[in-house]
């Protein structure tokens, strides 16, 4: 039976292109690349929203970016699921949202608990969970982005270690996005086409393992 994978994330999953201030071509977005590598053995659902946080309100946003509040509805929409990939935390680095890697880690833990405790319809089994640390924020000459993430370079560099420890504690899979991808200096937080493709390719082995493919 075809496996179903939900990619729950922010603009990195949506496919924001800092170079064009638009969206990467469908085939370049990491969930699309992951789909291509898995072929007909799995169906990969991209659920990305620009600005989404793990579990915090962004009162400057024009839509609900709180990942914890939206997640139960998304889970219900796409059930049954075999794997949920969580790639969030970069937007939590904004001081107006949370401002620390510790807060982002707490938020990821909240999402894991929501998935584990979800009232799945029709007695569906719950999915496996893969926590992915987003590639760390890098230096940029883009003044608005730099001003939005003061301290973000240092804090985001802590995410991989915190997420790895959390995954071990909660029995989730873990993948470090920094192992295959780097953020673009155009704005310091997003991925260019080459790096978003690299993320999709890099995730294939652990996703196959967790799906039993």
Language model feature labels by segment:
Residues 46-51, 177-181:
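Acidic carboxylate-rich catalytic motifs and surrounding loops in phosphoryl-/glycosyl-chemistry enzymes
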Residues 40, 64-213:
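Alpha-helical cap/lid subdomain in secreted, periplasmic
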Residues 1-49, 55-60, 73-76, 84, ...:
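Serine-esterase "nucleophile elbow" of acetyl-processing enzymes
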Residues 53-55, 184-185:
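Short secondary-structure boundary/hinge segments and terminal tails
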Residues 13-14, 51, 92, 182:
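Active-site micro-motifs of SAM-dependent methyltransferase domains
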């Amino acid at each position: 039976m075809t496996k179903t994978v939900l990619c729950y994330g922010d603009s990195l999953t949506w496919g924001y292109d800092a170079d064009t201030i638009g969206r990467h071509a469908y085939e370049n977005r990491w969930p699309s690349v992951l789909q291509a590598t898995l072929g007909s053995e799995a169906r990969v659902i991209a659920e990305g929203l620009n600005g989404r946080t793990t579990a915090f309100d962004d009162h400057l946003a024009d839509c609900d970016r709180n990942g914890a509040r939206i997640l139960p509805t998304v889970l219900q929409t796409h059930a049954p699921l075999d794997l949920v990939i969580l790639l969030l935390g970069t937007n939590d680095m904004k001081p107006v949202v949370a401002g620390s890697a510790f807060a982002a880690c707490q938020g990821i833990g909240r999402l894991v608990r929501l998935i584990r405790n979800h009232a799945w319809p029709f007695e569906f089994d719950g999915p496996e969970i893969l926590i992915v640390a987003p590639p760390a924020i890098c230096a940029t000459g883009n003044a608005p982005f730099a001003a939005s993430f003061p301290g973000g370079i240092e804090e985001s560099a802590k995410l991989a270690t915190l997420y790895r420890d959390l995954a071990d504690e909660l029995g989730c899979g873990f993948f470090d996005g920094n192992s295959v991808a780097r953020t673009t200096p155009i704005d310091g937080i997003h991925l260019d086409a080459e790096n978003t493709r690299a993320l999709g390719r890099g995730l294939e082995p652990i996703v196959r393992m967790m799906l039993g493919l």
